[in-house]
Amino acid sequence: KDSMLINSGCLLEAMQKTETLGTGGSKTVDFGIGLLSKLGIEFISNGEIILDPVPENFPFIDSVKATNFKSNLELRVLSDTKTPLLGKDSAFDVFGPQKGLSKEDIEKHKLEVERLITLIDKELVLNLNPNEIYSGAAGGLTFTLNQILGCEIESGAKYFIKETNLIKQLENYDIGIFCEGKFDESSLEGKIIGELLKEFKGHRYFLGGQYAAKNENIFTDYFQCGPEGIKNPKSSLEIATNELIKVLKKD
């Protein structure tokens, strides 16, 4: 449960050096609380300021003060998923298990996040909405970047595809090999692999750690490492790749 012991505070220095920030694949689930702390928002427990708040501290925070808060960052933020912070199929429901959280952990954390958002909104009066799309990337960091700090959020997948002219290049190929650590329904929610699958018309093969989507017809065939991939990733990937090569040779 390391995700409950770290926060996003380290981002501040990096954000001051760039105009475009890519989000996704984070380990923390602090939805930007660490960053807000660095920007002057005080998270208080029993009258004492928590200097470097992490998710594990959330149950103890009873008030929020923004006397020295600096907001409105001029930053372009790219999100790797459309998933919302809270609500149905929230970021914690979808990505929490990948970050080591149990179902019980997730339910408790969602309640604490909702409570903290209420405290923050009471102090800042921003009419915050954690159910909006694109608010759940990077452990909910995009929620804070957009709705509290005023950053523009856009699809990272669409940005990447546009900048690389990748869709046009796909027209030159009859076979596509798509790789993902774990492919599930969330892979189709704004991620690059999902956007490419919408456009690619040829034979589509999955190669990766685990195929967990309910729809088994997304790919022509799929080759996965499975549970063994966690223990022996290199050998498992070699085996899966060799199986794929055999199929491609037959075709």
PLM feature segments, named:
Residues 1-23, 27-251:
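N-terminal loops that bind phosphate or other acidic moieties
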